[in-house]
């Protein structure tokens, strides 16, 4: 294929988005089958939360390595290897008979997803110029709600009919085959589309100093700080929400998984597109659109999440859960665009790696286990979720409101407007 043809970036975006969808399907599959795993392996809620937390260790500890490599060596080989490894880990998760083995293979999934998650966003960014990039990244990250929803829906349905092991087997095989699709793509040069708009390319600092260098970009730091808190909330929400519906509102676990998955795919798809395109239009007019969408997303999600977990009525809880999902996914495109655009081109993979490390090390590494621990301690999953998750969203809103103010100040300085 000719990389210079107009359709080439779109074809590459389709392939990478499809693989990203499979990534999130595999990642959220565990949440759909928590109940049968708990029953068969006789695990506590804290142990169930630990499975997801250990996956995060594998994911974020290797992301700086892949970020370093992703700014320096051929991305296609690294990404293909990542897809193969996470798919193998998912497949083998269906053959375990003990907690330790399941944790081992979920960590392996984390290794593979770290490669793909760190490197592929920069690849997408290099396919499109700045005025189209946020829309492309929003499409790429549609995989989060859609893939996650497929994980919940298909995982719970397969587990109900054939057992939870079959769900992992079903999800593992496609990735082993789809990894080879990447070898049909040609990599765009790093910063290829920046040349078209006259942007300067910057070489990354040598060695591991690149990660220290990220702290010299205040907007990047504020984006990540808010993203850490949002991911803390989202991690606990994603793992425990179907189980919350099952225990507190007495839905069957297949019904709970199906409802949560269908709500996620509809609200997440609409919100990711709406947030991405609205932020692009707002950004063109004001220069602060990306930051505003982030701030409003967390500000509005916090009360919706509180109502979702506090409501005694199932209908109110379901409506509030759907509203919270819609509002939180408004930020998907803009937050990832800002991660890539607040640093020089030559540091994009490292910036994404720094994001992955931070949001998991200080975010959803802890929230699933914390909610599980408090649920065991208090004997009340509803109370545990209510105390932990909405509060984290308030913290996220604080940092992203600060980002709005900082961005306004930077824009005014760039325009030569004196500070009052």
Q: How should these model regions be labeled?
A:
Residues 2-5, 191-224, 248:
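Juxtamembrane intracellular "pre-TM" segments in multi-pass secondary transporters
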Residues 30-31, 218-272, 329-332, 336, ...:
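Extracytoplasmic gate region of multi-pass secondary transporters
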Residues 42, 74, 95-101, 112, ...:
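Helix-breaking motifs and short loop linkers at transmembrane-helix boundaries and internal kinks
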Residues 61-97:
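Conserved MFS/SLC helix-loop-helix module at the cytosolic interface between two early adjacent transmembrane helices
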Residues 77-91, 290-305:
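Structural signature of the two symmetry-related core transmembrane helices
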Residues 105-145:
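Cytoplasmic helix-loop-helix junction between adjacent transmembrane helices
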Residues 140-187:
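Helix-loop-helix hairpin linking two adjacent transmembrane segments in secondary transporters
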Residues 160-173, 252-255, 289-292, 373-392:
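A membrane-interface helix-boundary motif in multi-pass transporters
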């Amino acid at each position: 294929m000719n990389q210079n043809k107009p359709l080439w970036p779109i074809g590459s975006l389709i392939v990478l988005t499809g693989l990203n969808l499979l990534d999130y399907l595999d990642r959220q599959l565990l949440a759909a089958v928590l109940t049968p795993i708990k029953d068969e392996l006789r695990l506590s809620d804290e142990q169930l939360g630990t499975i997801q937390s250990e996956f995060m260790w594998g994911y974020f500890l290797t992301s700086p390595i892949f970020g370093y490599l992703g700014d320096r060596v051929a991305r296609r080989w690294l990404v293909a290897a990542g897809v193969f490894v996470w798919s193998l880990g998912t497949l083998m998760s269906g053959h375990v008979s003990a907690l330790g083995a399941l944790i081992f293979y979920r960590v392996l999934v984390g290794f593979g997803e770290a490669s793909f998650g760190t490197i592929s966003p920069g690849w997408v960014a290099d396919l499109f110029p700045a005025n189209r990039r946020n829309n492309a990244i929003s499409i790429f990250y549609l995989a989060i709600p859609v893939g996650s929803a497929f994980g919940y829906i298909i995982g719970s349905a397969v587990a109900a009919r054939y057992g939870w092991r079959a769900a992992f087997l079903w999800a593992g095989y496609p990735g082993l085959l789809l990894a080879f699709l990447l070898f049909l793509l040609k990599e765009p040069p790093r910063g290829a589309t920046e040349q078209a708009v006259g942007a300067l390319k910057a070489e990354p600092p040598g060695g591991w100093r690149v990660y220290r260098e990220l702290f010299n970009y205040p907007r990047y730091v504020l984006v990540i700080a808010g993203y850490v808190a949002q991911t803390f909330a989202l991690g606990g929400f994603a793992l425990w929400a179907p189980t919350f519906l099952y225990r507190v509102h007495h839905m069957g676990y297949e019904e709970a998984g199906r409802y949560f998955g269908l709500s996620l795919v509809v609200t997440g798809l609409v919100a990711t597109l709406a947030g991405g395109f609205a932020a692009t239009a707002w950004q063109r007019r004001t220069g602060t659109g990306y930051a505003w969408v982030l701030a409003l997303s967390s500000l509005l999600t916090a009360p919706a999440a509180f109502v979702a977990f506090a409501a005694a009525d199932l209908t109110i809880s379901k409506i509030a859960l759907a509203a919270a999902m819609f509002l939180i996914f408004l930020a998907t495109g803009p937050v990832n665009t800002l991660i890539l655009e607040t640093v020089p081109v030559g540091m994009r993979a490292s910036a994404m790696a720094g994001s992955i490390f931070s949001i998991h090390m200080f975010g959803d590494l802890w929230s699933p286990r914390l909610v599980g621990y408090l649920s065991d301690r208090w004997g009340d999953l509803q109370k545990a979720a209510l105390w932990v998750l909405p509060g984290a969203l308030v913290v996220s809103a604080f940092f992203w409101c600060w980002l709005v103010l900082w961005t306004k100040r930077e824009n005014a300085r760039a325009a030569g407007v004196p500070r009052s």
